[in-house]
Amino acid sequence: MAEQTTKDDKPLFGRPWIFIRGVPAMKFLPPEGPLEVAFAGRSNVGKSSLINALVGHKGLARTSNTPGRTQELNYFVPDGFSGEGGDLPPMALVDMPGYGYAEAPKEQVDAWTKLVFDYLRGRTTLKRVYVLIDSRHGIKKNDEEVLALLDKAAVSYQIVLTKTDKIKEAGLPKLLADTAEKIRKRPAAYPGILSTSSEKGDGLEEVRQAIRLTVGIPF
């Protein structure tokens, strides 16, 4: 696929981003067009903070994560595109519902699982899922279940460690190595592990570059 450029040659992450849609069911998905990358992770893993930090908009993801939208797929795109007549954004970020919260009723968990699996299995424009893991806790059982779901759906995913400012700096190399070993034999896992701190800004450019490479946008 040829590399894309963004409208007016503005850098992908150098322009404003906006929330465009919350998707509670497959029938509400936007038409397939721009490539998509999605973010998944346990509740309170720092998904909203990371998305906000990546696009430089402190309140963007939080605005869409109000009660009632927490079980939706939330779509964000660069601003300045009408969405009509071929004037489409170059890509979309998709914030997936957080998982692993004990108070969620079974019906809600089942609905989330169906929505997410249907999305993963049937969305041809989805290029990669970034699975966020809290550095303080590592990969937990809930995460293993999601990784297995991604493997089953044959969707490429990459692990992103979050909140690295909350652990000792000397422990990060071992955590990276241990995490890489845990996913080494998983068929859909991308081998490189990313590490971030939204609070300190660490690792953000590496994630941006990973996204650019994934969707074929050079800058």
Swiss-Prot record:
- Kindly list the GO CC terms recorded for this protein: cytosol
Can the keyword Signal be found in this entry's annotation? no
**Which residues of the sequence carry a binding annotation for GTP?**
41-48, 68-72, 95-98, 162-165, 196-198
- GO BP terms, alphabetized: division septum assembly
Database matches in CDD domains? YihA_EngB
> Which cofactors does the annotated protein need, by name?
Mg(2+)
Where, in this chain's numbering, is Mg(2+) bound? 48, 70
Which Gene3D superfamilies does the record match to this protein? P-loop containing nucleotide triphosphate hydrolases
Q: Which UniProt keywords apply?
A: Cell cycle, Cell division, GTP-binding, Magnesium, Metal-binding, Nucleotide-binding, Septation
Superkingdom of origin: Bacteria
- Any Pfam family: MMR_HSR1
GO molecular-function terms, A-Z: GTP binding; metal ion binding
InterPro entries associated with the record: G_ENGB_dom, GTP-bd, GTP-bd_ribosome_bio_YsxC, P-loop_NTPase
The task this protein performs is described as: Necessary for normal cell division and for the maintenance of normal septation.
Q: Which NCBIfam families match?
A: GTPase_YsxC
Give the family per the record. Answer: Belongs to the TRAFAC class TrmE-Era-EngA-EngB-Septin-like GTPase superfamily. EngB GTPase family.
Q: What name is this protein filed under?
A: Probable GTP-binding protein EngB
The scientific name of the source species is Rhizobium rhizogenes (strain K84 / ATCC BAA-868) (Agrobacterium radiobacter)
Gene encoding this polypeptide? engB
